[in-house]
Amino acid sequence: MTDTIFDYVIVGGGTAGSVLANRLSARPENRVLLIEAGIDTPENNIPPEIHDGLRPWLPRLSGDKFFWPNLTIHRAAEHPGITREPQFYEQGRLLGGGSSVNMVVSNRGLPRDYDEWQALGADGWDWQGVLPYFIKTERDADYGDDPLHGNAGPIPIGRVDSRHWSDFTVAATQALEAAGLPNIHDQNARFDDGYFPPAFTLKGEERFSAARGYLDASVRVRPNLSLWTESRVLKLLTTGNAITGVSVLRGRETLQVQAREVILTAGALQSPAILLRTGIGPAADLHALGIPVLADRPGVGRNLWEHSSIGVVAPLTEQARADASTGKAGSRHQLGIRASSGVDPATPSDLFLHIGADPVSGLASAVFWVNKPSSTGWLKLKDADPFSYPDVDFNLLSDPRDLGRLKAGLRLITHYFAAPSLAKYGLALALSRFAAPQPGGPLLNDLLQDEAALERYLRTNVGGVWHASGTARIGRADDSQAVVDKAGRVYGVTGLRVADASIMPTVPTANTNLPTLMLAEKIADAILTQA
């Protein structure tokens, strides 16, 4: 039985889904349905845990309230002597997705990222091809009149001006300048190494998610837009090799929804899982699970990217706490740094660091990640059950260059904190997982004296930064590993697109929120112009 008919059914109300729901429903003749498994987050009822933009760890202290419950993954690659335990992976399950729960840093990446996409077969996705969509999405409070920035988009972006930095932050900048890193001011228009006030998606001190920016009250009242939250897509409906709709569990009812086109925006773990359950993926894997093959696309679930990370923390001394309490609150948390490890001269700017001190938590921190990784992982289905999670292995540090980059990053941090401006605080730096920054780990200086212990610690404790991407990548039709074309259309079937971080050929040198906003804008434009 067919319950409802739409032109576009969007599966996943995260960052990308919010964009597409807005842009496609802007045309009154388009009947659009957005389906989200998690809760709604309307402007007048945003949970306080996710509203505070200056305390971005709060959602992670709320258990699985805003995340897919009990979703576990493997982070580190297999290695002799290293025990791998499944770890909880916080993937947003609420309107706005990752933009509602992750860090609020707004980073585009580097032009070379998108030129690389073009070289890998994503025609039209080079820097000049994506820049207009970065501009379209943003309302930059500091650089809105700059030709590289926008001043009229749905997402506000701002920074804490250096005039309002805390004394501790100023001391950190002095250490960085002594190490040869200049203030580049705008990380999204200057692409060399240096430090800067990070750009945030904030309105005042409030988080500004994609749902808040693209699904405000003026959009929600559109009669041609339907929003179903707390609803679970069970499967895609097919006729031959055509995708004709979705089966949805809504409350206690299972509904069959017909669509002219289905667009997957469920994220880099859930979107490929839906493809695989539909019979789109590596034929051998599908046969092994008894799933009829609709389209043999070996790249589905492969090419899984993530930024490897580690953290360093130290309890604040009395003087450090006092100095961290000055200036505007935002400046106490983070000072952004783009740096080069030197591991591979062909890929400079391969590290991204934050240095800060928070008088509320009583901790100084220096967290960083491999900004241009070389390791990739994969995901596979365990079974065909729509309620089962896929088996996910990020395979971090499988490429030895990434291990070298983490080591180099730790040595850079040691070098920065040894400068007189920071050394005066007498901070005892200890290792900590980025996913749960807390004191109590081994002292950094001790580990740096023992190469074997350092490597063992990194392989055991390496984290990610919730930047999963690449599992249904764009590419040319003759590329067996490509899953979608330049407009997000899935090869081998009709009526189906993917339009989230899954389609990234490589992970950008950036947090993935802004790139995901950009790509959703670009795919929406392609749909509306039928490119």
From Swiss-Prot:
Q: How does it assemble?
A: Monomer.
> What pH-dependence text does the entry carry?
Optimum pH is 8.0.
Give the residues the record marks as binding FAD: 15-16, 36-37, 68, 94, 98, 102-105, 233, 466, 501, 512-513
A single GO molecular-function term is:
FAD binding
Q: What class of enzyme is it?
A: oxidoreductase
Known cofactor(s): FAD
What effect is documented for mutating N511A? 53-fold reduction in catalytic efficiency on vanillyl alcohol
Please give the name of this protein.
5-(hydroxymethyl)furfural oxidase
- Record-annotated active site: H467 (proton acceptor)
Describe its applied uses: Because 5-hydroxymethylfurfural can be derived from sugars, the enzyme is of particular interest for the production of biobased plastic materials in an environmentally friendly industrial process.
- Which species does the entry assign this protein to? Methylovorus sp. (strain MP688)
Glycoprotein among keywords: no
Phenotype for V367R: 1.4-fold reduction in catalytic efficiency on vanillyl alcohol. Shows significantly improved activity on the aldehyde 5-formyl-2-furancarboxylate, which results in a better 5-hydroxymethylfurfural to 2,5-furandicarboxylate conversion
In the UniProt entry for this protein, what further remark is given in the free-text comments? At pH 7.0, phenylmethanethiol is oxidized to the corresponding aromatic thioaldehyde, benzothialdehyde, and no formation of 1,2-dibenzyldisulfane is observed, demonstrating that HMFO does not catalyze the formation of disulfide bonds. At pH 8.0, two products are formed, benzothialdehyde and benzaldehyde; this suggests that the thioaldehyde is slowly hydrated, yielding the aldehyde as the final product.
Q: Changing H467A: reported impact?
A: Abolishes activity
Q: What InterPro entries does the annotation carry?
A: FAD/NAD-bd_sf, GMC_OxRdtase, GMC_OxRdtase_N, GMC_OxRtase_C
Describe the function of this protein: Involved in the degradation and detoxification of 5-(hydroxymethyl)furfural (HMF) by mediating its oxidation to furan-2,5-dicarboxylate (FDCA), a biobased platform chemical for the production of polymers. Active with a wide range of aromatic and aliphatic primary alcohols and aldehydes: acts on alcohol groups and requires the spontaneous hydration of aldehyde groups for their oxidation. To a lesser extent, is also able to catalyze the oxidation of thiols that are structurally similar to its alcohol substrates, yielding the corresponding thiocarbonyls.
The entry's stated outcome for W466F is:
3.4-fold reduction in catalytic efficiency on vanillyl alcohol
The UniProt keyword set, sorted, is: FAD, Flavoprotein, Oxidoreductase
Q: What is its EC number?
A: 1.1.3.47, 1.8.3.-
Could you tell me what reaction this enzyme catalyses?
5-hydroxymethylfurfural + 3 O2 + 2 H2O = 2,5-dicarboxyfuran + 3 H2O2 + 2 H(+); benzylthiol + O2 = benzothialdehyde + H2O2
**Biophysicochemical property: temperature dependence:** Optimum temperature is 55 degrees Celsius.
Oxidoreductase listed as a keyword: yes
Protein family (similarity comment)? Belongs to the GMC oxidoreductase family.
